[in-house]
Amino acid sequence: WNVYTDDVKDSVASYGDAAIVVLSRIGGEGADLDFKETNYLALDDNEKEMLQNVAEMKKAGQVKKIVVLINSANTLQVDFLKNNEYDVDACMWIGDVGISGINAVAEILAGNVTPSGSLVDTYLYDNFSAPAMMNFVPTVYEGYEEGIIPEHAKTYMIYQEGIYVGYKYYETRYEDYVMQSGNSGAYEYHDDVAYPFGYGMSYTDFKY
């Protein structure tokens, strides 16, 4: 929060309507996520501090709403959306917007068009609740020689879970519990899943 100048902070307060908070992560084809000791897809301390300060501005009446935009092709851990300390009113996944996609985001925020898409991934309270995370480590190829193979091409991963990665695991795990298949045991779906695959809201209510 300290990296922002007073002019930036004052501009939010003088606007007074909605504070737009953008959370970004980098990762995709040919550029895997950062292997940190912490959870790269969770909020870091700087982001938490920023949301806390914006929430204080809202509490003081300087802004009316807090809207979070998730600028990432990967699924952030969204436990913060249910944290009253941050008091977030709305969140929209915008993916990697490219050169002109941000114009469409502005149209949505202004209410000129209505968002009607549904999530293509499952968003979790804790990304490490997935069994696949147990194998998410960079394994170096046997016989790898420094200077021969590019650094980014020296490692691989093993998917021991087969198809049960991401939403396929959570949906199947829950179905096994409901149907009492095998040794499924107890399972609380909503303790893991914040927003399921296919979830989506709009400015409009539809009747069928």
Set out the residue ranges of the language-model regions.
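C-terminal non-catalytic regions of proteins with extracellular/luminal or membrane-system context
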Residues: 1-207
